[in-house]
Amino acid sequence: MSAAARTFISIHIGVCFDEMDSPGSSAPSPPDLTIIPKISSKKCQICENPAHGKHFGAVTCRACAAFFRRFGISNNFKPCKTENKCSFRKNGYFSCKKCRMQRCLQFGMTIDNFQFDREPFNPLKMNVGIPQTVDTFSGRPSLILFSAPSGSSGPKRYIDVQFLVDRAVEVLLNGSETPYQVSNVLQKLAIGLQNIRGPQQKVSQIVTKIGKEGIFKLWEEEMLRMAKWLTYFDDFQRLPHSVQIEILNGVWFLFGRLENIASTALARKRKLCKDDMVMTCVNKNVLICDLRTLEIDLSWCSKYTFQQLKFFDQYDDLRQLDILINAMLDLEPTHEELSYMICQLCFHQVGKKLQGNILKTVEKLQEVLSNNLHDYYVNQMNQPKYSKRIARMMKINNTVEQCLYRDRVKADLMKVFEVFHVECSHPGIFLNA
């Protein structure tokens, strides 16, 4: 290129730049050509990858910094498989966390700059204060916190019931009042049940309040009726006398519970009592009461009232009792069926409780009664398909057993908190009464 041409090009370029710099020009400004410093060529002291900066006292990459931030406090790793002689880099992956942490510490990484408790909500700093209430002050929950009368604590009263046991033994020794010639044991038990259930044609007394004397009369009546009923059981009479007493002591309250349910159902059917009342018999006298309004005096055995003791059991016992009575009304068991239900319930419970020879004995008695019940359905009732009826009978018994279990749990709870201040000469007899 000639000198004249170069001069022309230079002049032309200068004119163009002057036009671009003029205020009226709309052309864009030239780009910023500031020189950017070259990225640092330092490597991570831990893994020798390109470093990001200084983290926790060492020049590291972001990955190693995050690793140390995560595991710098716990330092809880599995032992090294190569005795702390791992190669630190294998295709970009550290195979041993323990050796990686040791390398971090060797190059001076520390936890001094770690930041903790940066969350706006810190439960550790909250002042959790339990309000000072009567429950927290006394150390007892409101469920069992009662206002017992002052001066109620003292020596326990002793109740001797040996006379009751002696009377039951005497009844068993005397046997049944009248010998009966029947085809099987179940029929004889049905006859005995009719004899001991007492009159059910009219009401003798309506009970509104009951105390120590009335409670012991009920217990005595139920225990003696059970003993008298067992005298109609020939196979039971052949057992050793000690075994008879042991079985009687363990089941008399179950007999009273199931028999009273059946008696109440029969009384409601005959309109002898209202639908919200229950019935029982004491000394051939029919007694009825409304459990919702019945006053029970427990001052002779406890420093708490009956209403206060209801806090030990939130289950609606009265509703459960109505369910059982209605189920018995729908079933309308015959005396043979009711006798079998009572025996099955009593023998099952006493066998489960006493085990050993008693369990084997009651299982044999149940087998005899089961065969008699089969003969009763097939030969007398002409009902060979009776499985549904058996299922309804066992459903009632199972419900009674569930109530019995709840009573035992409640009794254990009352024992822990020393609700009753009495001692009985035979505590096992009245455990679930």
Curated annotation (Swiss-Prot):
Chain positions of all zinc fingers (NR C4-type): 44-64, 80-104
Subcellular location(s) of the protein: Nucleus
UniProt-listed SUPFAM superfamilies: Glucocorticoid receptor-like (DNA-binding domain), Nuclear receptor ligand-binding domain
Annotation: DNA-binding region: 41-116
Domain NR LBD: 177-433
Pfam families (UniProt xref): Hormone_recep, zf-C4
Superkingdom in the source lineage: Eukaryota
Keyword Nucleus: yes
UniProt GO cellular component terms: nucleus
Free-text function comment from the UniProt entry: Orphan nuclear receptor.
Family designation: Belongs to the nuclear hormone receptor family.
Protein name according to UniProt: Nuclear hormone receptor family member nhr-98
Organism: Caenorhabditis elegans
Gene: nhr-98
